[in-house]
A protein has these predicted regions:
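Conserved ABC ATPase "signature" region
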Residues: 104-122, 173-174
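A short, proline-enriched helix->beta-strand linker immediately N-terminal to the Walker B motif
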Residues: 145-149
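Catalytic Walker B motif of ABC-type/P-loop ATPase nucleotide-binding domains
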Residues: 151-155
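ABC ATPase NBD coupling module
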Residues: 62-79, 98
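Conserved ABC ATPase signature
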Residues: 126-130, 134
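Helix-to-loop junction immediately C-terminal to a conserved catalytic motif
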Residues: 46
Length: 203
């Protein structure tokens, strides 16, 4: 469960306030006009944007003052944040070991995650050698191996065409269901939100 309590973010003249609860395993679409603060909200929940006041609870634990990697949250940004000099296996492996010194069991986890998103056989390729859709799949695989209870996605598929974007959204929901995870995903398409997600949060 995610609880955002009396949250306030202040950035120069911009102010964002939020107060809501999301039950475990819900799939939430975050909608709102450009500049409303959708990315800021996810960044604040994930620990990347400082709070002026308020609290964030993940499964009953107050994570407001903890580092992003200690919150039980994984976040997928708009550009996917893949490192161009690393292979897809290495990029996904960063979700488990920032040093990439993985055990055999962890290497198998990475392999299974790449298989899950349809990238078996692409393990040794670098991001520049695959399509935009395949890059999005690799970024999703990195989120998958982290096995966090809360997944935040900041318009991760906005650069893709409608058909591929829909495919990636369906894959994301499938991954979330398999992991019993709660997801919040920013989208500009109300049809996507209505078709594939449980609730809509307007910012």
């Amino acid at each position: 469960m995610l609880k955002v309590e009396r949250l306030v973010v202040q950035q120069n003249d911009f102010s964002l306030r939020a107060d809501f609860i999301i039950e475990s395993e819900c799939h939430i679409a975050v909608l709102g006009p450009s500049g409303a603060g959708k990315s800021t909200l996810l960044g604040a929940i994930g620990g990347y944007v400082p709070l002026k006041q308020g609290s964030v609870f993940v499964n009953g634990r107050n994570v407001s003052n903890t580092q992003p990697d200690q919150r039980g949250i994984s976040m997928l940004f708009q550009d996917g944040n893949l490192f161009p000099h690393l292979t897809l296996t290495q990029n996904v492996g960063l979700g488990l070991r920032p040093t990439l010194r993985m055990t055999d069991a962890e290497k198998e986890q990475v392999h299974q995650a790449l298989m899950c998103v349809g990238l078996a056989g692409f393990e040794s390729r670098k991001p520049g050698d695959v399509s935009g859709g395949q890059q999005s799949r690799a970024a999703l695989a990195r989120m998958l191996v982290q096995a966090k209870p809360l997944m935040l996605l900041d318009e991760p598929f906005s650069a893709l065409g409608p058909a591929l974007r829909n495919e990636m959204l369906e894959l994301t929901l499938e991954v979330a269901r398999e992991a019993s995870a709660t997801i919040m995903i920013i989208t500009h398409d109300p049809k996507d939100a209505e078709r594939a997600l449980d609730q809509i949060l307007f910012v």
